[in-house]
Amino acid sequence: GHIENTNEEGKAVFDLASLEKLGMVSFQTASPWYNGRTTFTGIPLQKLMDYVGAKGSVVKVTALNDYTTIIPLSDFKKYNVILAVKINEKYIRVRDKGPLFIVYPYDSMPELNNQVFYARSAWQVSRMNIE
């Protein structure tokens, strides 16, 4: 995508360890996929976008099952969205929506509790392309 800092031809590729080195945060939130409040731990997506030097207005996210969603880059800062790698302190397995899950702090603002933001919350994330 449109990024300034690459580590492969025209792209930035990360493994779990390299993502974690960027710095992790945790928050608790209710969500439509789990009962009660769940603790999610991951990399702030604004930090990841800053790290790669993202230039664009949206990110196209593709999941392992080829589900795609488009997220405005402005969401990442405005809502403190994370790329979660852990749920309740455990790494997320593929069969449990892992290894990477885009999570908003849904119950921090009433506007986040709707289908628009749930649809942006891709799990089993395999690729993100800045457009």
Regions found by a protein language model. Give the residues of each.
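N-terminal intrinsically disordered, low-complexity segments enriched in P/E/S/T
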Residues: 1-131
